[in-house]
Design a protein with these regions (language model features):
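Cap/insert and terminal regions of metallo-dependent hydrolase folds
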Residues: 111-156
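Binuclear metal-dependent phosphoesterase catalytic core
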Residues: 59, 140-145, 156-177
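Active-site environment of divalent metal-dependent phosphoester hydrolases
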Residues: 1, 22-29, 58, 73-76, ...
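Residues at the C-termini of beta-strands that transition into short coil/loop
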Residues: 20, 55, 69-71, 155, ...
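Active-site-proximal loop/helix segment associated with metal-binding centers of metalloenzymes
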Residues: 40-42, 47, 60-130
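Hydrophobic/aromatic residues located in beta-strands of well-ordered beta-sheets
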Residues: 16-17, 65, 151
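Short, low-complexity intrinsically disordered segments
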Residues: 35, 83-84, 149
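Core catalytic region of metal-dependent phosphoesterases/phosphodiesterases
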Residues: 1-60, 128-139, 144-145, 170
Length: 177
């Protein structure tokens, strides 16, 4: 039987890491105090639920992860600001800059990149009708300048691999060595 505290399930021994997409309540997430965890900034939602913030590099076990969550909503005209759409769905200039600085600190080498949307070149293959924006442009720069083993992303509601790029929707994967 699950244990709940303030309506949030508590899972002793299980750690859940989350990264923002575009439909999260960014105001609520950003109301949590910023802490440091495994080399990067986080919000502890509970001791076992951790929000991995944008532009951070984390060392988890012997692997390094770069995170840049967020995306532009293509349906925001049907949504209500502060209820089903948040202006903070896209990263800020400070988050973009901090991300590049953090990547520079690790010599532009990480094991994994986690993002919600794709870099420009990949997005053209996945959803050519989506317009490029500041975030997809930024991720294209990351793609061209950072060495990585695999890149995992969501946003497009498909499960499909494009070489070392993995678009996840319903699939659950296990990271290997």
């Amino acid at each position: 039987m699950p244990i709940y505290k303030n309506g949030i399930p508590q899972s002793p021994g299980l750690l859940s890491l989350l990264m923002v997409s575009n439909h999260e309540n960014h105001d609520l997430l950003n109301s949590y105090p910023v802490s440091e965890w495994n080399g990067g900034k986080v919000h502890f939602i509970t001791p076992s639920i951790i929000h991995l913030m944008r532009g951070q590099v984390y060392k988890i076990g012997d692997k390094t992860f770069f995170t840049m969550g967020g995306a532009e909503s293509h349906d925001k005209i049907y949504r209500k600001e502060g209820v089903s759409w948040w202006s903070r769905e896209m990263p800020s200039d400070d988050e973009y800059e901090e991300g590049l600085e953090n990547l520079n600190k690790v010599n532009n080498q990480v094991d994994y990149i986690l993002s919600h949307c794709a870099p420009d070149q990949l997005q053209e293959q996945i959803a050519y009708w989506y317009k490029h924006n500041k975030l997809t442009n930024y991720l294209e720069i990351v793609r061209q300048t950072v060495e990585f083993k695999d890149w995992f992303l969501g946003h497009y509601h498909i499960d499909k691999d494009f070489g070392k790029y993995h678009v996840l929707y319903q699939n659950i994967i296990e990271l290997g060595d």
